[in-house]
Amino acid sequence: MKVLVATEKPFAKAAIDGIRSIVEGAGFELALLEKYTDVNEFYKAVADADALIVRSDKVTKEVVEHAKNLKIVVRAGAGFDNLDLAACTEHKIVAMNTPGQNSNAVAELAASMMVFMFRNQFTPGTGAELKGKKLGIHAYGNVGRNVARVAKGFGMEVYAFDAFCPKEAIEKDGVKAVGSVEELYSTCNVVSLHIPATKETIESINYDLLNRMPKGALLVNTARKEVIHEADMVRMLNDRPDFKYITDIRPANHDDLTQFGTRYFATPKKMGAETAEANINAGLAAANQIVDFIKNGVTKFQVNK
């Protein structure tokens, strides 16, 4: 039984050591494909793999078609839009993610981004505090819950909207549940985005929604760039000199947005899960899920049908 770890952006050594211990301890073989630059290297490596672990690497229909023995693929992280779920299902491959393993890392980054932007990117003599501000959490999953926990430490008033999370589950955490996404944006000084990129959410964060936000508003995006209507973001920043946007996913129109100076910031690459702890947690979770699936048929975190 061969487990392939294919990562253009490799795991930390400690994560690989842990993955190896889990995989080989279960009696399986571990193979590594790291820092590959040609997708053909991926095709060749996956050809005889029974299980696959990736990070942000794209598991396309073509990858799946080259993987003649593949039974399971695990995306080490919460988002799984880099997996072609239809292709996996067609080839009877179980696709999983590892929810919750990087949620604290993303939450800490989101909170840090709020401070950075409220201090006008650390411009001396200016800025404001988070204490007393209204924070809206758009999607109350593992990351959203951690953002709420951190924000309450700053003394923020926390609101949340999640169409799939019961009101009671939100409010038991001391967070105010609102009835619609429009209400969330109309109410809050800051909105922290945690929605996945799906056909329903792509470009759903548009001008009409953003323009509901109060004066001096900030949008923090540690989710996916695809959920932002990028042309509308330019329009919003142009029409509302009080509005700010920060993201850890550089948009396609980044150069257009830099004209807005300290009201816009994007990290040079996706940073939410870029901590040693998150890297290790997600890698070990992926390895454990593969072993549990192969040995016991456990499909708890399956994301395809």
Model-derived features with residue positions:
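Structural motif
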Residues: 6-10, 34, 56, 222, ...
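C-terminal helix-to-coil terminal segments
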Residues: 2, 7, 13-18, 25, ...
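Rossmann-like adenosine-cofactor binding region
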Residues: 60-64, 165-259
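Phosphate/diphosphate ligand-binding glycine-rich loop within oxidoreductases
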Residues: 31, 50-127
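N-terminal glycine-/charge-rich "phosphate-binding" loop or analogous flexible N-terminal tail
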Residues: 1-49, 157-159, 255
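Phosphate-binding beta-alpha-beta segment of Rossmann-like dinucleotide-binding domains, i.e.
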Residues: 90-153, 160, 168, 297-304
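Phosphate-coordination loops involved in phosphoryl transfer and adenosine-cofactor binding
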Residues: 70, 131-134, 216
